[in-house]
Structures are given as structure tokens and as C-alpha cells.
Amino acid sequence: MSHPMSQSQPATVKHDTLFTTPLDKAARFSFDEQVVACFPDMIRRSVPGYGQVLAMLPIFARRHCKYRQQGDNGQRVSRIYDLGCSLGAASMTLAGEFESQDLQIKAIDISPAMTTEATTLLSDNYPEHDIEVITADIRDIEFEPCDMVILNLTLQFLPAADRVAVLEKIYAALSEGGILVLTEKTHAFDEQYDAWLVERYYDFKRANGYTEMEISGKRNALENVLITDTLDEHHTRLAQVGFQRHLTWFQFLNFVSIVAFK
């Protein structure tokens, strides 16, 4: 298995220097062309465990994608949604481990800058695979029946009031035996634990070359844009929408990944 992070690289990957100079405190983080240009570097240096989460997706898919849906050519294929796909890293990781006729992937992101680059990367690397890149708000998607939904670092950018409705639609679309993989940044219920986790996360970023100005600048830009939940809140919400079984399979500091079973 090739390393998943090595596949999702634009032709020229820039070093993340977005917050090396002071910014207007009112400036909000957005997934624009500037972010796209340095996104792989940003993810590598600021999301602990992201590569490990990606690497497990094909392993999960082999257990839970049963090739139930009929393709146009009569072959049985399995449909997977990659929601908040950014540059398509999850989709490419799956495509790299499955034959082109086995999967139909719908990769969706609200950012035109992201989907434009993702389309190029996916078509260049996996031209034979059935991967559709869609520019849309996942809240507006009418999901088709599917075996697997990937929601990596995406729910946290939705208004809290909209999260249940999205998960309800995902649950309804999943086939029996299908799964949702939900990866999120979280905060701890206990303030002391949370403070420790946050500071260790900043240590992680410092160890990866980020300066105090960069750490502070991004924190300010993400305020009221990225809204975290506690791990318990995630599990409670999953149960609320109908998932009877769901477990935290991965945690690295305040980043967690949950698998929920239909």
C-alpha cells in the first residue's frame, strides 16, 4: 500500500506560510486558492494521525462495501461518499487499493478551489475509476444508497444546528452493514484535560515548524468557523440519528475518528 499522503499532492506543493505575518483579527479562515496551494503541507503539519486514518479506509471498505449497487455496465459496484473531500485524499487512497470496476465514489466539497484541484488530481492519477467530484454544500445533497460515507474533518465546519440533519440523511442512505467514518477535532469536557490536550497539540505544531504567530493567527482565523464537540456529544448524536453501534477506533491528542455501523 502506498502512503496515502503521497498521492494527494498538487503539481507544486507550497509550504504553509499563510499565518507568518499578522492578519486582520476579523479575517476568517476559508478554503480558498491560497489554502489549496499549501493544503497538503498544512494537513501534514497540523493534523496528527491524518495519514493513519486515510490508510485504514480501504481496510474498512473491504469489510463493509458489498458491491450491492448495479453499475451501468451490469457489474456490481459499491458506492462511497467522500464528504468534504478537499483535494480528494480519501478518494485517492480508496482508488489506489480497489479495481476501477469495484467502486463508485462521489467526492463532494463546497469549495470550488478545492474541487477544481481535486478533479485534476483524481483524473490524472485514476482516470479509469468512477469518481465524480461535485461542488456542493453537503447539507443540500440527496444521497443515493451507499455502503460507506467518509466525513473527515468536515462536520466541525457546519453550524451545530445542522449536524443532526446531515447525519440523519447519511444514516438513511447507508445500506445495512454499511459504515460512516467520522473524523473530527474535539474538545474535552473537563477543562483541565482540555487545556492539556490543546497545549500538547500546539507542541505538536511547534515540533512541525509552526511559530507562535502562526499558531495564534490560525487559531484566531478559525474562531467561530471550526466549532468542536466533545467525544460524548458525537456519540450521543450518532445514537440520536439511529446508529446503534459506534466506537472510537482512533485518537491522537484531540483528534478522533469514529466508525458507526448501520
UniProtKB/Swiss-Prot annotation:
**Does the record's keyword annotation contain S-adenosyl-L-methionine?**
yes
Q: List the EC numbers from the record.
A: 2.1.3.-
- Tell me, what is one Gene Ontology molecular-function annotation carried by this entry? carboxyl- or carbamoyltransferase activity
Q: Which reaction does it catalyse?
A: prephenate + S-adenosyl-L-methionine = carboxy-S-adenosyl-L-methionine + 3-phenylpyruvate + H2O
Which GO biological process entries does UniProt record here?
tRNA wobble uridine modification
Q: Which UniProt keywords are present, listed alphabetically?
A: S-adenosyl-L-methionine, Transferase
Which InterPro entries does this chain map to?
Answer: CmoA, Methyltransf_25, SAM-dependent_MTases_sf
* Binding residue positions for S-adenosyl-L-methionine: 50, 84-86, 137-138, 152, 219
Transmembrane segments in this chain: where? none
NCBIfam families found in the cross-reference section: carboxy-S-adenosyl-L-methionine synthase CmoA
According to its UniProt entry, the function of this protein is described as: Catalyzes the conversion of S-adenosyl-L-methionine (SAM) to carboxy-S-adenosyl-L-methionine (Cx-SAM).
- Quaternary context: Homodimer.
Family according to the record: Belongs to the class I-like SAM-binding methyltransferase superfamily. Cx-SAM synthase family.
Q: What is this protein called?
A: Carboxy-S-adenosyl-L-methionine synthase
Species name: Psychrobacter arcticus (strain DSM 17307 / VKM B-2377 / 273-4)
Gene symbol of the encoding locus: cmoA
